[in-house]
Design a protein with these regions (language model features):
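Positively charged n-region of N-terminal signal peptides that target proteins for export
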Residues: 1-4, 19
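Sec-dependent signal peptide hydrophobic core
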Residues: 5-11
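Generic detector of ordered secondary-structure context
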Residues: 10, 39-40, 105, 338, ...
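C-terminal motif of bacterial Sec signal peptides marking the signal peptidase cleavage site
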Residues: 14-17
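Flexible, low-complexity junctional segments that flank or bridge functional domains
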Residues: 19-257, 266, 272, 282, ...
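C-terminal "post-core" interaction segments
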Residues: 242-245, 250, 255-257, 266-498
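Short conserved active-site loop signatures built around small residues
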Residues: 260
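Short strand-turn motif at the edge of the Rossmann-like AdoMet-binding core
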Residues: 263
Length: 498
């Protein structure tokens, strides 16, 4: 957290008289400031009284200690952290500016590409940089860059054959990857090498659906029916229409088996996740519960509620199901909260027709309300009109605990990656784009055709000398962000709906 400091100037004042000139070298005392008049102090007080003392799931465990905090001594970020329960690894907050950027789907100061190294870089002796995913509106797309492309050079730096060999190379790369203009050299997935110059865009529009495909026998040998593939990065309220369009495509194609790829999905808006589960649920389940949320003793049972398949704001059930009879989820350590909740909500209904391929999920069984500051009625007039110019802070304290219709929660512990264990564990294949050649997708299709998963691909070392360097800047967010994972409900929306 960044702390603010006040710099005081010490002034020497020359006193002039008609008899002689003297100089007073004693500094004037710095003007006193009232810490209780600072914006952070006001926000801290509101956070404690209106949010943490009311909505926080562990309020009974922390209220007494929080009442003793001298909030005039804390920045807003430090105050938020100080108010959390000792075992809470999920609550977090962000600035209004950050919230606006995320919800608008605009990424600033980015090439619109996620770079990584292989999970098995040590075993493979391959410390090169690959594209994990690329947003459709990234300027690199027009040069043929896709997931699986290998970055072999940037301004003034040529990557060694087997990737980083020294910390100096890693430092240079991290320092200069955002240079603009930038000259890139990539080896594309088809083996072609391309070199081009691009200017860093002011922002990149995101599309949280990475892929929506229908596979048939022409795409994968042995398929006797169409199989849908849906890859979603995050649940965002502003992109629900995109989910609708994708599933209209699957329904038209007669899809009965679906591969749902949530490997990088850390959760998000509860309305968006409810929309997805309503499409995925087998026919005839409209109106059936998929999650029950319980609150602290101050709010329970009045705010405890159950969400139902196909029930939305108009309180009328909608049969949105496309008639699936088998679903394969691709998930990973990055799959958290709302994405885990979709899987958990379907478990009682699909039983052995629900499969999990990839790696153990994050393990986040709870959710948050979206709590804005300022939160007076005047501010909400702006928010409800889609104007967030007055928004300063957004808080996401844990407010409720989730279980499915059979009372089962998402597995969790005090360490990350403590969630659902896959039926078939497979590493992330970043050497191939999302599709039938990607190992996890191929594994699901193989199971559909043969009834069993294929053996793991053999990792062949390309380098007999283990002298490569891992770039810590590529560490996944679930490892670096102690409060990773979201299942979000808008507080004002909740008041009107439940």
């Amino acid at each position: 957290m960044k702390k603010l400091s006040i710099l005081s100037a010490i002034l020497s004042i020359a006193l002039i008289s008609c008899e002689k000139t003297t100089t007073n070298t004693d500094p004037k005392p710095a003007p006193k400031t009232d810490p209780e008049a600072s914006p952070d102090y006001k926000a801290n007080k509101y956070l404690r009284k209106e949010y943490m003392d009311v909505y926080y799931y562990w309020v009974n465990e922390v209220k007494e200690a929080n009442s003793k905090l001298d909030l005039s001594k804390y920045t807003i970020y430090d105050a938020f952290d100080a108010m959390l329960y000792k075992d809470d690894r999920w609550s977090w907050m962000e600035s209004g500016e950050s919230y606006i950027s995320t919800e608008s789907g605009e990424v600033k100061g980015s090439w619109g590409v996620s770079f990584v190294q292989r999970d098995d870089c040590k075993e493979a002796g391959d410390y090169n940089v690959y594209v994990r995913f690329v947003y459709p509106e990234s300027p690199l797309v027009r040069h043929g860059v896709t997931r699986g492309a290998k970055l072999t050079g940037i301004n003034g730096f040529v990557m060694p054959e087997h990737g980083f060999e020294s910390n100096e190379q890693v430092d240079y790369f991290n320092e200069h990857i955002q240079d603009s203009p930038q000259t890139f050299t990539f080896t594309l997935t088809d083996g072609e090498s391309v070199t081009f110059e691009e200017t860093l865009p002011r922002s990149v529009s995101t599309n949280f659906i990475f892929s929506e495909q229908v596979f048939d026998a022409d795409d994968f040998d042995g398929l006797t029916e169409p199989v849908g593939y849906f890859n979603l990065l995050s649940f965002k309220a502003g992109f629900i229409d995109d989910i609708d369009k994708a599933f209209a495509k699957f329904k038209k194609a007669g899809v009965k088996k679906m591969i749902v790829d949530l490997r990088y999905n850390g959760g998000g808006d509860s309305n968006a996740s409810q929309r997805l589960i309503s499409y995925l649920a087998p026919a005839g389940l409209e109106g059936k519960p998929y999650v029950t949320r319980s609150h602290n003793s101050l709010l329970a049972p009045s705010l405890d509620f159950t969400a139902y398949i196909g029930l939305f704001e108009n309180n009328k059930y909608s049969d949105m199901a496309i008639g699936l009879d088998e679903i394969f989820f691709i998930m990973d350590h990055s799959s958290a909260s709302a994405s885990e909740m979709v899987f958990n909500g379907l478990r009682p209904y699909l039983k052995d027709k629900l499969h999990l391929v990839g790696r153990q999920t994050y393990g986040k069984p709870n959710g948050m309300y979206i709590l804005f500051y300022p939160a007076d009625d005047e501010a909400y007039k702006y928010y409800n009109a889609g104007n967030y110019s007055k928004l300063e802070w957004v808080f996401y304290p844990i407010c409720f605990f989730n279980v499915n219709s059979e009372g089962e929660s998402i597995p969790y512990g005090q360490t990350t990656a403590s969630g659902f264990v896959p039926d078939n564990e497979r590493p992330d294949d970043i050497l191939h784009d999302f599709g039938v050649e990607e190992d996890r997708v191929k594994a699901c299709l193989t199971y559909i055709v043969t009834g069993s998963y294929p053996a793991l691909p053999v990792t062949k070392s390309t380098n007999s000398v283990s002298n490569g360097i891992e770039n810590k800047a590529f560490a996944p967010e679930w490892k670096t962000n102690p409060h990773y994972g979201t299942d979000l409900v808008n507080r004002r929306s909740l008041t009107e709906t439940f």
